[in-house]
From Swiss-Prot:
InterPro entries: Rab-GAP-TBC_dom, Rab-GAP_TBC_sf, Rab_GAP_TBC_domain. Interacts with Rab11. The modification Phosphoserine is found at S58, S64. It is found in: Cytoplasm; Endosome. This is Ecotropic viral integration site 5 ortholog. PANTHER family: RAB GTPASE-ACTIVATING PROTEIN 1-LIKE, RAB-GAP TBC DOMAIN-CONTAINING PROTEIN. One of its GO terms (cellular component) is cytoplasm. Residues 352-463, 494-583, 627-772 form a coiled coil. Keywords: Coiled coil, Cytoplasm, Endosome, GTPase activation, Phosphoprotein. GO terms for biological process: regulation of cell migration; regulation of protein localization. Residues 1-31 are annotated as: Disordered. Residues 116-300 form the Rab-GAP TBC domain.
Amino acid sequence: MTLTTTTTASSAESQAKMDVKGGALPGEENLPTSEMDLLAKLEAANKLIESDAKSLNSLHSTHSRKNSDTSQISLTSSGNSVAEEDIWTTWATILNDWEGALKRKNPCVSELVRRGIPHHFRAIVWQQLSGASDGDKKQYAEYIKATSACEKVIRRDIARTYPEVEFFKEKDGPGQEALFNVIKAYSLHDREVGYCQGSGFIVGLLLMQMPEEEAFAVLVQIMQQHRMRHMFKPSMSELGLCMYQLENLVQEQIPDMHIHFQQQGFQTTMYASSWFLTLYTTTLNVNLSCRIMDVFLSEGMEFIFKVALALLLTGKDTLLCLDMEAMLKFFQKELPGRVEADVEGFFNLAYSIKLNTKRMKKMEKEYQDLKKKEQEEMAELRRLRRENCLLKQRNELLEAESAELADRLVRGQVSRAEEEETSYAIQTELMQLRRSYLEVSHQLENANEEVRGLSLRLQENNVSIDSNNSRQSSIDELCMKEEALKQRDEMVSCLLEELVKVRQGLAESEDQIRNLKAKVEELEEDKKTLRETTPDNSVAHLQDELIASKLREAEASLSLKDLKQRVQELSSQWQRQLAENQRSESERTTNAVDSTPKKLLTNFFDSSKSSEHTQKLEEELMTTRIREMETLTELKELRLKVMELETQVQVSTNQLRRQDEEHKKLKEELEMAVTREKDMSNKAREQQHRYSDLESRMKDELMNVKIKFTEQSQTVAELKQEISRLETKNSEMLAEGELRANLDDSDKVRDLQDRLADMKAELTALKSRGKFPGAKLRSSSIQSIESTEIDFNDLNMVRRGSTELST
């Protein structure tokens, strides 16, 4: 009978272990479909475990607890294989009842995650921790069929993602294709984020553990729940916040390193931006990255900050002795090797770092305020730049308009002077023509009188043929003189018409001058407004010099034009006089042929007298013209000198006026600065008094808080001890109840009694030593409860086996 019971017990125990590993638990047929799928995944994972040599040794071990003398011997003899088997079974039970574990907020889950998730369970646990849904997996198939605008960029960056990993080495291989599909699908899923280079390393780490659909679902949850999508947006607002928080944490927890970084100009973004964008996948190896991802999915972004501080603390002694370039090389090459040398120590250091959530939120608020101020300042700066550009354009337009109006004014003055000169010349010519007309009319009257006298002589005396010929010649001369008088009359009429035209032009020029004067007045008003704006001394000086140079240039051009016109007039008059002299000589020669000797003598004497008279008149005219030109040149030179002196006086007066205004402004600013300094000193004294009062209040409040904290910690410790005591009592009562209900199973009862005795002995020993911390005792009690639950399951299986044998 004893032989059959022992064999059935051992077979039942092994069957129970296999059921736990395979996911076949009691009541499996009543589970929903989602849990059935989870159990199927666990079975697939267990098959992979059985293929491993270590796991096979642990699974097919023939060691049984009932063959051991005491429970203490069984616990120590199991070794690493039993501990690994316990981890596997613990994860299997947690995954079987994942929702229940989350509802109870089982602390064992986070503790197990910190120890490291087994490789074969990692894919399922990551999905459960991230909360990946089936809806994202269904959308993945639709996204693969679509096309993305980022495909070329993704293809370019895939070859640079995990180049040392065998799965991603082959070009256009299954690894690279899977990586491309997942990244493309997420770029279509979240079009605001699209594609960022750092996301490829996170996707590659997920694809090393799970298929494409599951990796896509986990990636979506990572981006949404842990605010990673804000880090990959084009603005990268979350990355800036993380850098600001990390810099403040380094300043608070590692102040000497922060001072060294500030002295070397080593910004936080130079070494930490890739840590947060890729979750340390580009810095550490794959195994360490997987463990960081385990805790990141469980605890969130806070653990990434802890890892960053742990890395800085690991290399602190070396970093304090390096410059900026050497620090960059150290972060890239030496620091990962130091972490890999002591992985558990590194993670324990990271777990030991404490972060205050209130302080982190306060830093986030400070960063948002800083960003808001920066945006306001940038908006104000952009507005001022736009206004400055508009003012510059307006100033340039006003300068161009003023220059154009000044040019127009100068041109108007020049044209007016030219018109005055032309009108003066026309008037002088008109006066000359009138004089010549009077002379010619007087000569015509004399000629008419001579004709009358000659006609009377012809009637009285009959002269010879020679006299008739002479009369005919005199008549011809008179006809020629009449023709010359007619030509002069025509010239006078033409000159009168030209005079009318010139007067019309003068009227038009006067109208233009009025318009120009009105514009000049407007320009003077604009100049007054511009002068009131108080430009810089250099600009004002240049403007004054420009106006003066333009006026000088205009005056010089006017004088040059006047001189040219005078020279042309003199040359034209000289040529005209030469032509008239030649014409008169030719007429004299023609008349001399037909005239008598007596007339020739009289004509010769008359011509000599007239030529002498004309020469004298010409000489006097030339001398007067030359004197007039000399006086005009002297007058213009004097005017230029006067203009220069006036401009210099105006420039000097403007400079003196501006200097006086600047002096007044400087005095006012000095007085304002003195008053401000006094106000600021008074405010500083008030602030110092307030600061001292606040400091004293803060010290009092801090002492009160410390006292309250110690009291609360004492009450918490007492409550924890009470909870642990009640839990141990509960476990003892449950064990005693099971023992009373199952008195037939003698072997199991003995084992349980031995275990209870050992536990009681341990409890008494701990109490006697005084080492009874709440958290450790609670965890040990939980482990003991779990082990007793497993033993109770074994006991139920034994019961079933005995009933089957009896039937």
